[in-house]
Amino acid sequence: SRGLGDVYKRQDEVYKIELLMKQAKISTEMRRTVPAALAEAARECGPAAAIELPDGSIETGKTSNLLGASAALLLNAVKALGNIPHGTHLISPTAIEPIQKLKVDYLGSKNPRLHTDEVLIALSMCAATDKNAQIALEQLPKLKHCQVHTSVMLSEVDIKTFKKLGVGLTSEPVYEHNRLYH
């Protein structure tokens, strides 16, 4: 767990990095995912994320009633990589709702939205009977070395999922909620 001292240490580290970047005449906006994520967040008035795919295209994800921004981003990315139409539901909302009920009613979570690991498990279950979900699942290795930026700091579980996928991740130094611990 992180304490208040860790927050101050992190702020000092951020300041040092910002200073080094200024001296090197580089900015975060040089990563194409940064302005894309921030623009999506401004458009949606909520958390958003962007990924640069191997072909250089940018996909975004936003927070919804069902999914966190990072989970939506992963689904949009694998759809794009698998040439699956954007409007296609890889996971039925009726499949997501029981997972949300489990999280909130039985596991005590305050956040009903699916995280990245949960959405990937749901996708793998759907892949057993849905060809598009199977195609999407097969795209996951293509995410290795892709770059992601999020408009808010992520939960530990989302950070770990991106790391396991081999995705480079940065985020704005902003918490989604006014809480010290995510």
Show where each model-derived region lies.
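Short, small-residue-biased leader/transition segments that mark boundaries at the very start
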Residues: G3-Y8
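Cyclic nucleotide-binding regulatory module and flanking cytosolic helices
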Residues: K9-K16
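C-terminal binding/interaction regions
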Residues: Q11, M21, A36, I96-H182
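Conserved mixed alpha/beta catalytic, RNA-binding, or beta-rich assembly cores of soluble enzyme
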Residues: I17-D117, A127-D130
